[in-house]
Regions:
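Short, hydrophobic/aromatic-rich segments at coil-to-beta transitions
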Residues: 17-21, 52-59, 83-85, 103, ...
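N-terminal amphipathic/basic-hydrophobic helices that include classical n-h-c signal peptides
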Residues: 1-13
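Mixed-charge, glycine-accented linear interaction segment located at domain edges/termini
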Residues: 129-160
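Short, well-structured hydrophobic secondary-structure segments
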Residues: 40-94
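A short, structured loop/turn motif at beta-sheet edges
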Residues: 15, 49-53, 77-80, 109-112, ...
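Hydrophobic/aromatic beta-strand elements that line small-molecule binding cavities or substrate pockets
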Residues: 46-49, 73-76, 106, 123-125, ...
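Long, hydrophobic N-terminal alpha-helical segment
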Residues: 10-60
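Acidic, glycine-rich flexible loop segments
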Residues: 90-135
Length: 160
């Protein structure tokens, strides 16, 4: 029901925000040796990019299949574009921080179930600018209790 969903982030624009197209291509690899499972994910959606207090935010809605939807916010400082935060709010919620060769802990919340994880980032390349969009690449490993559960490579293309 529409009343149960968070408000759409695509309304009344100011000079510090604009509508953008968000294209996501991801390669997700789980398992090892003969038990490797590989998924290629492609998502294209509308979003809003904001510039406020030296931070760029890109907000977009993602459909998670049977779990429902999530509002995702990618953000970074203009001065440190290669330290990126992804906040997901919805049926599955979490906050992840990506900085090359760094590890950050987080908690994934899925209704009544929560679990801790670690993001070990291998690579961050960010050419996204508020005035022209760009490309963000995130290459990272997700671990639970020190065990790798998924390798992820994301490419976000942001265009006005």
């Amino acid at each position: 029901m529409a009343g149960d969903r968070p408000p759409t982030p695509f309304c009344s624009m100011t000079s510090n925000e604009k509508n953008v197209k968000v294209k996501i291509f991801a390669v997700l690899v789980r398992g090892e040796d003969d038990e490797v499972e590989r998924d290629n994910v492609r998502i294209a959606c509308e979003g809003v990019m904001r510039l406020e207090d030296g931070r760029v935010e890109i907000v977009y809605e993602e459909t998670l299949g049977e779990e429902g939807t999530a509002i995702n916010t990618l953000s970074f400082s203009v001065e440190e574009p290669n330290v990126v935060t992804l906040a997901r709010d919805g049926a599955a919620s979490c906050v992840m921080t990506f900085s090359e060769n760094c590890r950050y802990r987080g908690t994934y919340h899925m209704g009544y179930l929560s679990f801790d994880f670690t993001v070990a980032t291998r690579r961050v390349e960010n050419s996204v600018r508020f005035d022209k969009g760009g490309v963000l690449i995130l290459d990272y490993n997700t671990e639970m209790q020190g065990v790798s559960i998924q390798n992820s490579k994301f490419r976000f293309t942001i265009t006005a």
